[in-house]
């Protein structure tokens, strides 16, 4: 097998071609440690995404509402480059950045159609983790 050349080893990632998708879904997953915002088309194919960590926050600052706001703004801007105008929001998780991320999507210029909470609730399945003692 011939050795890899420098050009093929350091390949630049290609940017997605601009799609004209006007209606989509915004999935906000807000945990106690991070907030991830994914904007998809109506079938669920991801168009843009951002997280508190990807925006530049590290450690405990990722879990703040401000970090969620910045992540939602960045995801919304990238989605608007593909023609996104209206989104239905699906919120999952107990984190502190839920409401802030929704408000940030509206402030960025996306029209929010509906908001649904899709947090998974156990019907007495696995035993939960032990209570923290501080």
Curated annotation (Swiss-Prot):
Gene that encodes it: rpsK
InterPro entries per UniProt: Ribosomal_uS11 (IPR001971), Ribosomal_uS11_bac-type (IPR019981), Ribosomal_uS11_CS (IPR018102), Ribosomal_uS11_sf (IPR036967)
Listed name of the protein: Small ribosomal subunit protein uS11
Listed PROSITE patterns: RIBOSOMAL_S11 (PS00054)
Coiled coil: none
UniProt xrefs under Gene3D superfamilies: Ribosomal protein S11 (3.30.420.80)
One GO cellular component, as annotated: ribonucleoprotein complex
Subunit structure: Part of the 30S ribosomal subunit. Interacts with proteins S7 and S18. Binds to IF-3.
NCBIfam families membership: PRK05309.1 (NF003698), uS11_bact (TIGR03632)
Domain of life: Bacteria
Family: Belongs to the universal ribosomal protein uS11 family.
GO biological process: translation
Biological function: Located on the platform of the 30S subunit, it bridges several disparate RNA helices of the 16S rRNA. Forms part of the Shine-Dalgarno cleft in the 70S ribosome.
One Pfam family recorded for the sequence: Ribosomal_S11
Organism of derivation: Micrococcus luteus (strain ATCC 4698 / DSM 20030 / JCM 1464 / CCM 169 / CCUG 5858 / IAM 1056 / NBRC 3333 / NCIMB 9278 / NCTC 2665 / VKM Ac-2230) (Micrococcus lysodeikticus)
GO MF annotation: an example: rRNA binding
Keyword tags: Ribonucleoprotein, Ribosomal protein, RNA-binding, rRNA-binding
